Swiss-Prot record:
Source organism phylogeny: Bacteria, Pseudomonadati, Pseudomonadota, Gammaproteobacteria, Pasteurellales
Gene3D superfamilies hit by this protein: 3.90.940.10
Coiled coil: none
Function recorded in the entry: Promotes RNA polymerase assembly. Latches the N- and C-terminal regions of the beta' subunit thereby facilitating its interaction with the beta and alpha subunits.
Official protein name in the record: DNA-directed RNA polymerase subunit omega
UniProt record similarity statement: Belongs to the RNA polymerase subunit omega family.
SMART domains: RNA_pol_Rpb6
Amino acid sequence: MARVTVQGAVEKIGNRFDLILTAARRARQLQLHIREPLVPEDNDKPTVIALREIEKGLINNEIMNAQERYDALEKENSELHAVSLLSNQ
């Protein structure tokens, strides 16, 4: 089990409050298996994995926002495709 210090993660995000929000959001993604971890899991809990990813600069709010926008566009495109298939019948 890896130890994580929040100081490195705070430096990447800017302040402790934003770090808490970012880490919680990322941990939720990991816990619900919405996204795969970007660092080895090493039997760690999602909160620790999220902090390690933030500390390494792999995750921040901008990255997560971009991923969510991409997912929303993909979902919208697949729904439009399904509707077009149904309307062609």
